[in-house]
C-alpha cells in the first residue's frame, strides 16, 4: 500500500516530526543518567531494525501487487541491485550521522546540535533532491531561503557557543570551593538513589537547572565527561552528522526513483518499503559493528565495556528500545510522505523544533543563562 494523496503525505510527515524529534531526547536522557552510549545505541539499533521489518511485512504486503509496483517479498527476488546499493548507502550515512549526533548532544546540547544538523540537511539535501526531482519547484524561491537559513543558524550558533561558555565559566567561578566539596561528598548517596534509571533520581534532578550545582552534579553523573574539553569537539561532531544526514535522503530518492537509469530494462523501481528494508539493514550492520568496537575501544575517554556487561546492563534499556522504535517508524513515515509529495518537501520538513522543545523543557538548556545567550 503506497501513500498517493497529498493529504496522506502531509499526515505522514507531521507524525514523523514527532517521532524523529523525540527519540534523541531519550538517548540524551540515558547518557545524562550515566548509561554508556554504546549500550544505549546497541539497544536502539535492534528495535530500529525491527520497525523496518514490521513496516515491510505489513504495509509492503498489503494489497495486490502490480507489475510496476510489486509487493515487498516479490521484489526481493528481482534484479534491482543498483537501487539496493543506493538504499544501503543511505542507511550507512544515516547510521554514521546518528552516532555522531549522539556524542555531540553531550558537548553542545540537544537543541543546538539539532538546529545545526537540520540546517545543513535542509541546504544540501534539498539542493540535491531539487535536481533529482527534475526541478519541480522554483529555484529562485527555494535556494535563497535555505541559504539564508544556514547562514543565520551558523552565526547564531557561534555567538551562542561563545556566550554560553562564558555563562558556565562565570557560574562555576562564583561557586566556592567549600560548597563544591560538600556537594561532591554527598554524591555517592545520590548515585545509589538514581540506580533505577526509569524512576530514580539523584540530587541533580532536584537542583534547579542551569545553576553551578546542577552543572557539577550532572558532570559527575553523566557517561560522557565534558568538563575541560573543547566545545569544538561537539561542533566537529555536529557538522559531521549534518553532512551525513544531508546525504541519506538523496540516496533514498535515487533508490526509489532511479533518476540515473541504473536498473535493467523491465525491472520496476524499488517501492518505498523495499528500499527502507535495505536501508535499515545497512544502518543496523554499521551500528552494530561500530558500537561493539566502541565497547572494547571507546572514544572520548569513556570506560571500556564488553558484550557481557552490555547484556547485563538492563537499567534504562526500555527507553533505548523505545527510541529505536520511534526512529524506525519516523523514518518510514517520512519516506512514505516523501515518495508522495517529493523528497524536496521531505528534506525541508525537519524536526529540530520538536527536539529543541525537549532540550529546553526536559534538560533545562539555556536555563539561567545571560541575556546575550537568550538573544542568540
Swiss-Prot record:
Its main location: membrane. InterPro entries: UPS_plant, Ureide_permease. Pfam families: Ureide_permease. Residues 31-41, 102-103, 159-231, 296-317 are cytoplasmic. The keyword Transport applies. It is a multi-pass membrane protein. The chain crosses the membrane at residues 10-30, 42-62, 81-101, 104-124, 138-158, 232-252, 275-295, 318-338. One of its GO terms (cellular component) is membrane. Keywords: ATP-binding, Membrane, Nucleotide-binding, Transmembrane, Transmembrane helix, Transport. Residues 1-9, 63-80, 125-137, 253-274, 339-376 are extracellular. GO terms for molecular function: allantoin:proton symporter activity; ATP binding; uracil:monoatomic cation symporter activity. It comes from the Eukaryota. ATP binds at residues 223-230. It is found in: Membrane. The keyword Cell membrane does not apply. Transports a wide spectrum of oxo derivatives of heterocyclic nitrogen compounds. Belongs to the plant ureide permease (TC 2.A.7.19) family. This is Probable ureide permease A3. It comes from Vigna unguiculata. The gene is A3.
Amino acid at each position: 500500500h503506497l501513500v498517493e494523496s497529498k493529504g496522506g503525505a502531509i499526515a505522514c510527515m507531521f507524525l514523523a516530526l514527532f517521532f524523529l524529534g523525540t527519540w534523541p531526547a531519550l538517548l540524551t536522557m540515558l547518557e545524562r543518567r550515566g548509561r554508556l552510549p554504546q549500550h544505549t545505541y546497541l539497544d536502539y539499533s535492534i528495535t530500529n531494525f525491527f520497525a523496518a521489518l514490521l513496516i515491510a511485512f505489513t504495509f509492503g504486503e498489503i494489497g495486490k501487487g502490480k507489475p510496476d509496483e510489486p509487493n515487498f517479498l516479490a521484489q526481493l527476488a528481482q534484479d534491482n541491485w543498483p537501487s539496493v546499493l543506493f538504499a544501503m548507502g543511505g542507511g550507512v550515512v544515516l547510521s554514521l550521522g546518528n552516532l555522531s549526533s549522539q556524542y555531540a548532544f553531550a558537548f553542545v546540547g540537544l537543541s543546538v546540535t539539532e538546529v545545526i544538523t537540520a540546517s545543513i540537511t535542509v541546504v544540501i539535501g534539498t539542493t540535491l533532491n531539487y535536481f533529482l526531482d527534475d526541478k519541480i519547484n522554483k529555484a529562485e524561491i527555494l535556494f535563497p531561503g535555505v541559504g539564508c537559513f544556514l547562514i543565520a543558524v551558523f552565526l547564531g550558533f557561534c555567538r551562542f557557543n561563545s556566550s554560553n561558555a562564558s555563562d558556565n565559566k562565570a557560574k562555576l567561578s562564583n561557586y566556592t570551593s567549600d560548597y563544591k566539596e560538600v556537594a561532591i561528598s554527598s554524591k555517592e548517596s545520590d548515585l545509589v538513589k538514581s540506580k533505577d534509571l526509569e524512576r530514580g533520581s539523584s540530587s541533580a534532578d532536584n537542583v534547579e537547572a542551569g545553576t553551578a550545582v546542577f552543572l557539577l552534579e550532572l558532570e559527575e553523573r553523566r557517561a560522557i565527561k565534558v568538563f575541560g574539553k573543547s566545545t569544538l569537539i561537539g561542533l566537529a561532531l555536529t557538522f559531521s552528522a549534518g553532512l551525513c544526514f544531508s546525504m541519506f535522503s538523496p540516496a533514498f530518492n535515487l533508490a526509489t526513483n532511479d533518476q540515473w537509469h541504473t536498473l535493467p530494462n523491465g525491472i520496476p523501481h524499488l517501492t518505498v518499503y523495499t528500499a527502507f528494508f535495505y536501508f535499515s539493514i545497512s544502518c543496523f550492520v554499521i551500528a552494530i559493528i561500530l558500537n561493539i568496537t566502541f565497547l572494547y575501544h571507546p572514544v572520548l575517554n569513556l570506560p571500556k565495556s564488553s558484550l557481557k556487561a552490555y547484556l547485563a546492563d538492563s537499567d534504562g534499556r526500555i527507553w533505548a528500545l523505545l527510541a529505536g522504535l520511534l526512529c524506525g517508524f519516523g523514518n518510514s513515515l517520512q519516506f512514505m510522505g516523501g515518495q508522495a509529495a517529493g523528497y524536496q518537501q521531505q528534506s525541508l520538513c525537519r524536526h529540530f523544533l520538536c527536539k529543541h522543545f525537549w532540550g529546553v523543557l526536559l534538560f533545562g538548556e539555556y536555563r539561567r543563562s545571560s541575556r546575550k545567550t537568550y538573544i542568540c
